Amino acid sequence: MKIKNWSHVGIVVDDLEMMTDFYVNTIGLERLHESDARPQLDGDHTGVPNVHRTLRFVGIPGDHEIELIYFIDPPATDGHVDVHKFGSTHICWDVEDLASVYEELKDKMKFVTEPKWRTRPDGSTVGLIYGQDPEGNWLEFTQRP
């Protein structure tokens, strides 16, 4: 098997409009495309019978995308996992200036800490911060050499 390319990460959301607003107007991604997803005649790949969803993609055109998945029927239920538990996930973006990203976003989202800097074995440093979107999904921003 050979992986050809990255495609997207999917996040199940409770409030599609709020989450779209956050990722577009706070994080700075673009709204790319959307579909009204209903099962095909041959069934549905999700394993949820007769599922009806709205799939909205945000991201950087020509690059990685985030699929915001809103379950219309049956509605989704809370399934958040603490950051230190199996099954926990996060999305990470590389940024040019971690300190300015933190200053710009600190009043718009919840961060766990201020930016932290780590020295790598080769002597270079990497900065990172962890935070959460409005529905509690984990986000990371890193500044690499």
Feature annotation, model-predicted:
Residues 12-63, 100, 124, 130:
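Core segments of cupin and vicinal oxygen chelate
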